[in-house]
Amino acid sequence: QLPERVRPECVVNASSVSIYSSCALPMDEFSVIQPDATFFQAQVWNAVEQRIAELQLPGVRTVIARLGLVVGADRLMRRMLGLSRGYLGTVLGDGTQRISWISRHDMLRVLHYLLSNREQRGVFNIVTPQPITARQFGAGIARSVNRPALLRIPAPLLRILVGELASNFLTSADVVPARLQMADFHWDLPDFGEAM
């Protein structure tokens, strides 16, 4: 129990849209989550969020930020851009799985908005309103370096190459940022092509 004089006004906890497991239908913050016993990340994030709910401090506003794929200058994006420059741009699986994403720029803006607005609390999906397919993702990355996305890695081969991590790339995440939309939040980069 923290003394009142050192309690923060707000605590933001990072979570992931992976909590929704593989969702064929759009999911938002009000959707009932059915934990998938076969998807490890969904189990982990479900356990994290349950623990956060148990640790509520009186008078402290809690925000759970369920992050989608963050598109920015990180190691994963640099690697994918490098592969595309070398004509090794890929589409993972059959390319139809949905990816819920957000630009690094807009993610920081959302977090600032949530910290600055005292009435905002609870779960927020930190994604754009425009999810894309894995095919669009691979093509968008390749296009940003003026190359074609020539390769496709089938799901069985991806499972052989990276094992259990393959499920991170092969599951569909059609996640809607309903609470941000209800708050009339405006994304600067809602289009994947622009974000790249």
Residue map of PLM features:
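Conserved Rossmann-fold NAD(P)-dependent oxidoreductase catalytic core, especially the SDR/UDP-sugar
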Residues: 1-38
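Conserved beta-loop-beta element that borders a ligand/cofactor-binding pocket
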Residues: 10, 15-16, 50-73
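Catalytic helix-loop patch of NAD(P)-dependent Rossmann-fold dehydrogenases
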Residues: 24-64
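Glycine-rich "substrate-gating" loop/helix at the edge of Rossmann-like oxidoreductase active sites
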Residues: 36-41, 66-74, 94-102
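Glycine/proline-rich active-site loop of Rossmann-fold NAD(P)-dependent oxidoreductases
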Residues: 46, 58-60, 71-79, 114-124
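Alpha-helical substrate-binding/gating segment
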Residues: 81-89, 96-132
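Mid/C-terminal beta-alpha module of Rossmann-like enzyme folds, strongest
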Residues: 114-164, 196
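C-terminal amphipathic/interface module of NAD(P)-dependent oxidoreductases
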Residues: 132, 167-196
